[in-house]
Amino acid sequence: MGKIKAIIYYIYFVLSVFVVIFFMAIKNSSHRHFRRIWAKFQRYFLRYKIEIIGTPDENANMIILNHQSIIDIVVMEEIHKANLSWIAKKEIARIPIIGKIITLPKMIAIDRSNPRDLVRVLHEVEDRIENNRVIAMFPEGTRRKGNKLLKFQTGAKVITEKLKLKVQPVVLLGTREILDSHNFCANFFGNVKVVYLPLVDTTDKDWLEKTRSKMQEILDENLYEDSNELPDANKNLNQIKTDKISEK
């Protein structure tokens, strides 16, 4: 049954991407608005709920996230107040028509097979930040199968330190239970939890690995199953704000 649901959802997803691309193409100034509406319709279709713990830091110009499912992007497009510019694989941008979801709203496509492409990416990141965008990236580089975070790629560290960015980690829980691309399975209804951690101290030379460890702590606590207790990695927040977004 889960595979049938996945087929139904992927058909819906692709069609909805065509629709949002069409609207972005005809009205260049409203890309963010259309993307947020699109993300809400994904939630309405899959019928999941979102709980937010912590608060997006207005000073952050980059967020780094764990990657479990394509729903990770959908959730953040709906709830994050800033206009996100995602760093994505160049292969996606090359897909006919679908690739416009990267190029039209000025996301950043990176060629992971070419280390020299990082120079171009740095220029594009700088441009997006100058235009009040917030960079979003998955330092793992790809979706993982298990519950352990993959090693964080050095690209996030290079971009952050070269451009002196302020980085906020975000942990997503429960998205793979909604849509699991590895096992090609979807579940309508479910709960997603988004945990905003404090800004990272990027003056620490080991900040990337320490951030990975903190994010892993959140995952290990299975926070989406126990919303009343925060893991140690998040107890230093001065104030915890929890918002719930229902399927209604």
Model-found features: residue ranges?
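A transmembrane-helix-recognition feature enriched in membrane-embedded lipid enzymes
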Residues: 1-51, 100-101
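Short, basic, glycine/proline-bearing loop/turn elements
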Residues: 37-39, 60-61, 104-111, 142
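Residue-level detector of anion-binding/catalytic polar loops
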Residues: 49, 85, 108, 134, ...
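Conserved H-X4-D acyltransferase segment
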Residues: 35-88
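Membrane-embedded segments
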Residues: 73-124
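Non-catalytic C-terminal accessory region of glycerolipid acyltransferases
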Residues: 120-248
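Short acidic-hydrophobic, aromatic-tinged amphipathic segments that line or gate anion-handling sites
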Residues: 52, 108-111, 202
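Short, basic/glycine-rich phosphate-binding loops at helix/coil junctions
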Residues: 18-19, 100-105, 190, 194-195
